[in-house]
Amino acid sequence: MSVNDLIKEGVSLFKSNNFDQAIAKFNQALDEIEDKNSQLEEQNNIQSWLGRCYLEQALKVRDITEAKGLFAQAIEHHQEQLKLAKQLTNEQTSIQKQNNAQHWLGRCYLEQALKVRDITEAKGLFAQAIERHQEQLKLAKQLTNEQTSIQKQINAQYWLGRCYSSQGIRIKNSSQAKDSSQNEVNDLFKGANGYFLHSLKLLSQFDDEQERYRIENIICYHLRNIFFLRSKWNLYFDKKKQEIRETLFSNKDKGKVLNKKLEGSISTILAVLNIPPIELGLTPLAHYASSSVCNKLFGVVNEDDSSPMRIGSSSYMNDPSEGEGLLELLSLQDLELENKVDCSSHNAFFACFSSRVNDLNQFRLYGKEDGVEASGCCLVFNKNGDWLKVPDISAPFRSFLKNLDENSAEFKETDISNVEYEKLPLYQVAYIAYKDEYIAEEKCEIWLDNFKFGICLKSVDKNSEWHKYRIKKLKEALQQLIKFFKRKANVNDENKNALEYIRYLFKDFAFRDEEEFRVLKMAEIGSEEIEYCKTTKSIYLPYADISNVVDEVILGTNYEKTHIRYKAEVFQHQMKQKCPNVKISRSSLPIYANPPIKKD
């Protein structure tokens, strides 16, 4: 097999995440080149892919010592790549290959800076990353092909912006940071803002329209985050709302344009309740499950019985009025006086999380096995602020959008199965209260419709200023919705259907203590993405393999007090072998085991 064929096989293995096999294949290709003074471009290519393999492995590893070793190997290969690039005889090819090597060296230092715990060590790594990307920028300017030069300059400017913004966030969130660091943080955010704006300016000169649009969205997302970090709430919120509005409503048929006021209110509510990574910050979230489900999620006890986390149907949630609260607020309840009604073509599916970690009530309700309260598990996400990915705002609604707009090329049926579930956006649930003599006014931040209805929404990540801004925007949008639907002419199927975007983001006030967040997905009944569970006799959507993203599993107080007789040390032992980076702990919340097994 030729060197190039071996490289192709290695690339294929890399793209399928088989990094160890890819490394072996690339090393085999390297061994095929006996004269190391020949085939320099092939050697350069091999070193680049080897570096990327080790970088990907370093990103997936939780143990910092192991990660550092992998980063070191990645850097070694990219340095060799740079050395080989400088030996190439064609000047422009040499510059382009050097540019590529500097890019990946910068990425290695940046990702390592984000991993290490010590802030001083992180600053040193950020400095090296910035140095590499500045070299990348210099090389990009030397390329004679104008479009290639512009593209490479945009890339370098973008990653310089990422280096500055990431360093600012890291210092801001660091427990080692002092009050005097605020000026340093502000300077870093200003620097990031400058690089992102420079890259946008260059982007206007780029000819590839489709690629220009893609890059613009990415840069604008990070620019928007800078607005948030600098407490520029109006700019941040307006950009966030604009993206949602353009994503969900710009592809509709000209003959089916949604009322602008309704469109604006829905976009505002989505912008308030959507919680991207920058807003979630370091807030840990919990998912409670039975011990049997926990075993399946991590593939322990019975490896053949492993399963990804599921997104469950709204039909089987604990709230029988799921999705009805907002309709009642807007006086849009269906009376259902007919002898039969048509079944809905779509349904909402969600995976639920709570900001109440190791919480007694949550353990009693959702963390139980065999009917025994607090015998299940609490899975903790986002302790390090690295759980959420950049969300795809359209992902939850693609099948729904297809149904609303059959002529939209962006949402063809073939696209629906390609949704990356891990990029589904996270939403905070708001709670609707119905005013009575027992609900104090201070229990709700918002009161509507002459104090008939109240809205309860907790602050996220202890950012009181941003929370006040969100409350203001949510109140305005709900008032507009109430006013809109009071006009009988506006009460029609098209306008009511538009509420599908938001009605599952509200729950009854009785569930307020759950402090729920949810990942939401609308799915068409009968579509291939929906799966059936014989055990629970219910339908669901597969969500994601969460074994590499859970930070901690807290075993309930009564974990060992069920008929199944699970043992905590057995679970700990098997998790240490299977998922060594997940912390295992025991809850000591004061609760007796209810039947079938009582207190010893």
Language model segments and positions:
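Conserved alpha-helical positions within TPR/SEL1-like repeat arrays
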Residues: I7-K15, E42-E56, K97-E111, K152-I169, ...
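Short coil/turn linking the two alpha-helices of tandem helical-hairpin repeats
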Residues: N37, E56-T65, T89, G106, ...
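Flexible helix-coil transition and linker loops at the boundaries of alpha-helical arrays
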Residues: L30-N44, Q81-N99, Q136-Q153, L200-R212
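Partner-binding and oligomerization surfaces adjacent to conserved cores of proteins
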Residues: K201, C220-D600
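Alpha-helical segment of the N-proximal tetratricopeptide repeat
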Residues: S2-A24
